[in-house]
Amino acid sequence: MNGGLRVPRTPRHGTPLYEPIPESPGRVFALQTRSVSELDWDSNVVWQFAVPVNLGVGDLDRGVIFHHDVVRRANGNTLVLCSVRIQVPAISPSVLTDDCIIEVTPAGEIIWQWFTFQHFEEFGFTTEARQLIAEARNGGDWAHANAVSEIPPNHHSDPAFTPGNLLVSYRELSTMIIIDKATGAIVWKAGPHDNLTIGQHQPEVLPLDLPGAGNVLTFDNGGEAGYPTQFRSFSRVAEFDPLIGPRPPREPLA
């Protein structure tokens, strides 16, 4: 190896690839607000899916966008994080940005979808949190999902960790959840009121071939997030047993 550039992030015609997400073997996902494309290392598009006009949840969902994360499942289907603009009076009198997950076949058919607002009661929000969410701060982006991953084979006996279930991260809620892929129910969560992570990103269940297999590894951002807002002035990488939960963060050494 001589250190030369093998693959530029920007194609020759100069259009930036927004949110390039590595995928193996030898592929990368380019996620834009209106489409997701799978590219080979020569920037050839080998698969593409355009944003649907709506997802059938109401008159306001014509603003569907893709964001943050794309996952290729073992069965060849693709999971995409997206958001819709909806109004849910039971949550807020204002228009909200709600996060959803769709599963798309290689042929471009949506065969599964999951909306956060439909599971609002499963998060266990306090009365205070409900009032703050109703105020629709941040333009109504009340939960702000930033990652989704598929649970890999693991040694846990808890059915929440059945391979194929989905681990999802919500920045604004400082919460991670597991969705039962078969039923859609939230079957595990860390947050929203233990304040052990703040604005975390990219949680993953470690696979069997890595040290700590079955643990959750996440980047715990810190900063401001939560209802009510919590603040921490530093970030950390946290690995924890999901049946015990993350430990409270310690102040970094000076």
Segments the model singles out, each with a brief description of its role:
Residues M1-A254:
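Histidine-/acidic-rich catalytic cores in large beta-rich domains
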